[in-house]
Amino acid sequence: MKLDLFQMQQCWIQARVFERADKAGYDMTAFVAAFMGSSAAEGLDADYDRMQWAGEAYVLESVVNEAKLVPDAAAQKFDREALFWAGFIYRFWSFKTGEPSRAIHARFPLADVLSVYPGFHTISNDRAVEEMIAIAERRAA
């Protein structure tokens, strides 16, 4: 799937939201679950929504406020590049399939995305999403 410039920008923004959340010290498992089920994610999933024109700082603040998240110094730490890719690939997945963020996260939570990162970040985004969907479908069967 070839994304247009606007869609590609949305993928990069979501990736940077995940990166900023990690830098700010949020528990990323909780943050990603909150993000993927948030009104901000619903806006990014929509055909058109003002959230699509917001920067990553605004999107992050929106999710943090909605979910009432606070930084957690004791939270498990993850590789920041893997988190960046997770944000990117979740948004790409939504564009590719039309699935809402909430449904994607329910099928393939952050732990699963991070577990496939070492091999999947080196293949095309299309193939990575197809493989993640196949894994999720095998697991559900």
Model-derived features with residue positions:
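N-terminal interaction modules that seed assembly of large macromolecular complexes
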Residues: 3, 7, 11-63
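Structural motif
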Residues: 4-10, 75-84
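Short, surface-exposed acidic
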Residues: 26-33, 70-75, 98-105
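Long, compositionally biased
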Residues: 49-82, 96
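Short, solvent-exposed coil/turn linker segments
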Residues: 55, 99-100, 124
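Low-complexity, flexible helical/coil segments
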Residues: 67-70, 88, 109
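Long protein-protein interaction modules used by eukaryotic assembly/scaffold proteins
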Residues: 84, 89-106
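Glycine-rich, aromatic-bearing surface loops/beta-hairpins
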Residues: 112-141
